[in-house]
Amino acid sequence: MKKILIITDAWEPQVNGVVTTMTTVVQKLREKNFAVDVIHPGMFHTFPLPNYPEISVAWNFWDLKKKIEKSNADFMHISVEGPLGVTGRHYCLEHEIPYTTCIHTKFPEYVYERFGIGLDVTKGLLKWFHNSAAKTLVNTESHKAELEDDGFTDLVLWSRGFDEKIFYPCPEGGKQKYLLYVGRVAVEKNIEEFLKMPSELPKVVVGGGPSLKSYARKYPDVDFVGFKKGKELADYYRDAACFVFPSLTDTFGIV
């Protein structure tokens, strides 16, 4: 049985597209009889990311070497460009171990929206991180083309799917006639464009995030219902008149 080691700075209990993607990948790989080890922040001492307490950052990541060697995996994948990812990259290069990485989102645009850091700075760091990988997985053809224009190399398309047993259309169309946003409630999602736009229909927001409390106070006419999963989430989609997704920093957008 082949063993795959995944190193990720994004893992449960975080709720976001990266975590949804990677937990699903691990589940499906194990169903196909792969052995999968995951190294994640929950295995280390962590501190909450400033201004984003939902995200835990590992700080004693020098213990990563022992965990990699203990896994003795046949393949290695580094999912996120965080402290664990950077340390895992260094280990692989030092020991001449080929590995793959993944670009989940338009991170330079995300960082610019949240912190005002120039796009070229972040793109340079990402190229340094990813261009040493054997292959880098990307979500869409359009994002792949953008990254190639920016100088990223060895890119491979890795799209997404959904569980059609849970997510299927309502034959009658939206029953409750509201506008729906699903995703992280944060400034980089450009969600305020949705919240402030005029509409004759009520608005529903599914999800949480650092801007939830402030937006809920600012837009009391919007129904913020928090995180939802599985059938409950699917029901919100089925009952909506229209799904609105204003983000300018997403690639595929797992919501």
What are the residue ranges of the model-derived segments?
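Nucleotide-sugar donor phosphate/pyrophosphate-binding loop at the beta->alpha transition
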Residues: 98, 109-128
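Donor nucleotide-sugar binding/catalytic pocket of nucleotide-sugar-dependent glycosyltransferases
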Residues: 124-169
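Acidic anion/phosphate-binding donor-loop and adjacent secondary structure
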Residues: 162-177, 214-216
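Conserved donor-binding/catalytic core segment of Leloir-type glycosyltransferases
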Residues: 171-206
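Nucleotide-activated donor-binding/catalytic signature segment of Leloir-type glycosyltransferases, i.e.
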Residues: 213-232
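Short alpha-helical donor nucleotide-sugar binding micro-motif in glycosyltransferases
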Residues: 235-240
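Aromatic "clamp/platform" in nucleotide-sugar-dependent glycosyltransferases that forms part
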Residues: 248
